């Protein structure tokens, strides 16, 4: 891998971390409590897990320097759902809450957009 590619990937990761932090801050302003960030299991990962009242949201952050409105693939959605299932097994006290799978879109110099209930698990 060339130095230029490595540097571009490093910048993209940094932009993604900043975008996730901005999204977490916006969610707090909207009354959510952040339960976890970067929850990872072999089955998948979730960027942000947040709770507001009886709602537990599993949030995927998509950060792009250009238009961020890229749709999640079915494979990506399945990995997020599997990670959510693994998370729920570790936190049985949250079992009675309503679940939401959300998407937050972040573009350069734009306020993050929160798409609540962006998709439903395929069952």
Question: Where would I find each of the regions flagged by the language model?
Answer:
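Residues forming the ATP-binding cleft of Hanks-type serine/threonine protein kinase domains
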Residues: 39, 62, 118
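Mg2+/Mn2+-dependent nuclease catalytic core
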Residues: 65-90
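Hydrophobic "anchor" residues on beta-strands that sit immediately upstream
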Residues: 33, 56, 98
